[in-house]
Amino acid sequence: MAQLMPDVSKYRPDVKFWMVFAAIGLFAVLLARPQFGSKLETVKRQGVEVMIALDISNSMLAQDVQPSRLQKAKRLVAQLVDKMENDKVGMIVFAGDAFTQLPITSDYISAKMFLESIDPSLISKQGTAIGAAINLASRSFTPQEGVGRAIIVITDGENHEGGAVEAAKAAAEKGIQVNVLGVGMPEGAPIPAEGTNDYRRDRDGNVIVTRLNEQMLSLIHI
């Protein structure tokens, strides 16, 4: 499926996201194994299971993507859920740790409620544990046979922990499609300091600038 997916640096986040969704939809149709012959038959798209791994580290508060990286990501996920049919969705949130925000479900109303409640305060430990998120997502699918499975990682890729590439390869070996959506700009942006009109600063008083780590994300894209 990698050849169907856009490079993480080529397109705006919303364009990339819908290319990801279209590719997953095509994968589901291929799983249905349509037979071609003299009789025209309608092939119903087989449902897929999609685990969203969403970065909620403080850098996702940067506003180089409006209204912020995190809010943009949440809006795109909500739009994806609205388009689902016969599919299941679950959500992993991660920063320095990763945990399940929503077990995989076909209850789209609940999915959007859980999505709305996501914010950086859910995880106090900072970092970008992409590998842990992918590993957790890989274990979160149902045991049902004959269904497509995909993980969509949404992150800026900054300050990532080790093991992300290895986790993506391990998931791919299980037949799980691993897709990465980079949110942010390579030029970077400061991180708003919550409750103030200022930005987060380092120990020397310098404004912290967070940048999209395109190079690392391209390695995870399996």
Language-model-detected regions and their locations in the chain:
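Juxtamembrane linker/hinge segments adjacent to transmembrane helices in membrane proteins
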Residues: 1-24
